[in-house]
């Protein structure tokens, strides 16, 4: 039976990424679909391009050739064209003309005038997201953060790896952003995946009315529930919303018997070094009972720093170092000793902490 909120096959919705061969978003090999839009404002968000529900632009100055086409195309005058900057370049050269009796060559510093061009500057307050600068840029320096897609287009991408799901016990995960922010889209996608025989998972903050979650349960195999912090005051400070609704929904999910994994981002200044946090998570997991299949510890990583730069945003955690498995052994022990659930530590796959 269709929900009145469910979208139809002809409608478009924004997708920031379809990540194939994902191994961090549920069991097995998976394809993760990232939807755009989220009611939370997590200060460390590693997908900041997914926060706003409308399309935006990435500006990568490393790819910019300073041609100025973007500024010429902007009808709002929101882009300052590349600026010529005169400077000096210093270089060291060896002086081969030694003084009488001197055998060593002397290094001398020389200066030469050079001309550089600073990249264009985008005034995000003037920008109306008309995307004309995206069309004008031929070098990929200015791009859209998301693509408008239909249900069938997403299904085609996801179903193309169906063989790998079956051999690895994987499937499709809907993430974001917050997929519950788009209940009709999420419901329609889950229904299509299940009709195709693809296992489903939902990566969510749990911040939505229970009725929204309840509509999805029939088509869900697993819920990946993010637990940022169980201290409500901290939760409001760092995410912009209370965690009361999230905890209530976790308990109601457990009552239905739906399997879930609790996912714990460990973030500097928020919950790192705070060992009361894993103890509180253990207490919650015990309340949730057999529904908790596992608990995944997710160490902070700085990948979103460059994304925020390309979005023209300030990033609170700029310069903070990555966390690694060895940084979180105390967390792991508390959680592993706290119950029968599986415990994993995620993070940057294949990257080891420098010695």
Model-predicted segments: where are they?
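Conserved Radical SAM active-site core
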Residues: 53-219
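N-terminal pre-triad scaffold of radical SAM enzymes
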Residues: 16-69, 119-129
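Auxiliary Fe-S-binding modules of radical SAM enzymes
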Residues: 1-25, 268-355
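Conserved AdoMet/S-adenosylmethionine-binding subsite of the radical SAM
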Residues: 152-310
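Residues that scaffold the ATP/ADP-binding catalytic core of kinase and kinase-like folds
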Residues: 41-45, 73, 82, 136, ...
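ATP/adenylate-binding site constellation spanning eukaryotic-like Ser/Thr protein kinases
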Residues: 35, 47, 76, 139, ...
